[in-house]
Amino acid sequence: MGQAVTTPLSLTLDHWKDVERTAHNLSVEVRKRRWVTFCSAEWPTFNVGWPRDGTFNPDIITQVKIKVFSPGPHGHPDQVPYIVTWEAIAVDPPPWVRPFVHPKPPLSLPPSAPSLPPEPPLSTPPQSSLYPALTSPLNTKPRPQVLPDSGGPLIDLLTEDPPPYRDPGPPSPDGNGDSGEVAPTEGAPDPSPMVSRLRGRKEPPVADSTTSQAFPLRLGGNGQYQYWPFSSSDLYNWKNNNPSFSEDPAKLTALIESVLLTHQPTWDDCQQLLGTLLTGEEKQRVLLEARKAVRGEDGRPTQLPNDINDAFPLERPDWDYNTQRGRNHLVHYRQLLLAGLQNAGRSPTNLAKVKGITQGPNESPSAFLERLKEAYRRYTPYDPEDPGQETNVAMSFIWQSAPDIGRKLERLEDLKSKTLGDLVREAEKIFNKRETPEEREERIRRETEEKEERRRAEDVQREKERDRRRHREMSKLLATVVSGQRQDRQGGERRRPQLDHDQCAYCKEKGHWARDCPKKPRGPRGPRPQASLLTLDD
């Protein structure tokens, strides 16, 4: 308790330098953020058993690789470097991965020559082994049955076939059939009535706490299915490493879908899984939606109680997983349970939540479309994959895309005839033509230099204009001064009083003119002073 759970994904992130070195040796490049996105969000949706926390299982990695390398529109070329790097780490594991890589079981070896764990010392009481009995070809003496310390009569897989699904094991005298069983390795699941009933607990020699190593149903060597329940560590990790159903129903639904696909749980396992990962109210809602999804013979949802109870019972059914009929019932039950999870995860209609989904600055159009479709599934009753809703999804995709992409999409010719796929391809072209950070820095630097040059040119032009304006104002001022002096002189002469026809202009007396004025001095007339003019140099 209190310790961080190590998963394949967290392990690679802790040794990211080694991951980058492996990718470099393969001549590819990987990014940490996309590494996390593909591992936890993309590859689990391929329905090949990939867990959200990653895995080093080469079979699952190969299935994901096939999906990634699929030709045509179903392929994912952008994920090729990541799955190739992950495969290289699993095939040729570095030292920090080797403890978490489990060797494949020797299925090709004959049953008489497998590698067996060493026998315990004689001084130590041997524990019950749940592995199939393997005898040496040279030793014809039957191997004695070894029982646990407790005296309870338990079913031993060494000598008997596992019981059918409905048939419980014989009751233990003390009421607990697992009281004397000791886990073969550390991290074994806690004892439970289911374990004591079916005697199916099995732990691998080296267990990874984040990846289940025991599927509930496995085909045994005798042709019958053997039952191994979920380990408590798996249930604990699933519950603590994922959000609640109310918080993020899509993520938890994807986890349960992966578990249903890879583990093939029984009816009891499904109830245990729902009881661990869901609250009581959430579980009831899921069961109700699953029962609504039951279809009749006509392929339509039915309301007949008998058909609903036969397909999705609320009480433990009598389904024997060793028969084809029982396995078919379990497969149908899991499908209905998954439909109930998907329907119960839909929130009340809230178009504001859908409109709030906008494309990030560095988000690809494909990733944005997936988030938009998920919002439609979560906050509306509409299916975004429905052809009737394609127009609404397309309009939301255009209006809520990045501003540069949205503007160009709106200007497309014959926009009404474009399908959603056409819009995504056009958006991808626009997104890929965006300038790189280096180009953006170069453009900003160039624009800054051009702006600075324009500013300097404007300053010079402004200074020249200021000088010309000052020169014109000074010229106007000087001209005004000169014209004012002239007007003063001319205006002074015009202000002389008007004389009568017989009045002297010199003495202002009547009866004579100025040339005959006796008061006017007689003598030579002096030169008239000239008015001085100011120039711009003065």
UniProtKB/Swiss-Prot annotation:
GO terms under biological process: viral budding via host ESCRT complex
Pfam families: Gag_MA, Gag_p12, Gag_p30, zf-CCHC
Biased composition range(s): Basic and acidic residues: 434-466, 486-519
PROSITE patterns: ZF_CCHC (PS50158)
Keywords tagged on the record: Capsid protein, Coiled coil, Host cell membrane, Host cytoplasm, Host endosome, Host membrane, Host-virus interaction, Lipoprotein, Membrane, Metal-binding, Myristate, Phosphoprotein, RNA-binding, Ubl conjugation, Viral budding, Viral budding via the host ESCRT complexes, Viral matrix protein, Viral nucleoprotein, Viral release from host cell, Virion, Zinc, Zinc-finger
Renumbered ranges of motif PTAP/PSAP motif: 111-114
Motif annotated as LYPX(n)L motif, chain positions: 130-134
Lipidation, N-myristoyl glycine type: 2
Signal peptide, first to last residue: none
GO CC terms of this entry: host cell plasma membrane; host multivesicular body; membrane; viral nucleocapsid
Residue spans, zinc finger CCHC-type: 502-519
Comp. bias regions, Pro residues: 110-124, 161-173
A molecular function (GO) term: zinc ion binding
Motif residue range(s): PPXY motif: 162-165
Coiled coil: 438-478
Modified how: RNA-binding phosphoprotein p12 is phosphorylated on serine residues.
Residues found modified as Phosphoserine: 192
PANTHER family, sorted: GAG_P30 DOMAIN-CONTAINING PROTEIN
Name of the protein described by the UniProt record: Gag polyprotein
Source organism (scientific name): Friend murine leukemia virus (isolate FB29) (FrMLV)
Gene: gag
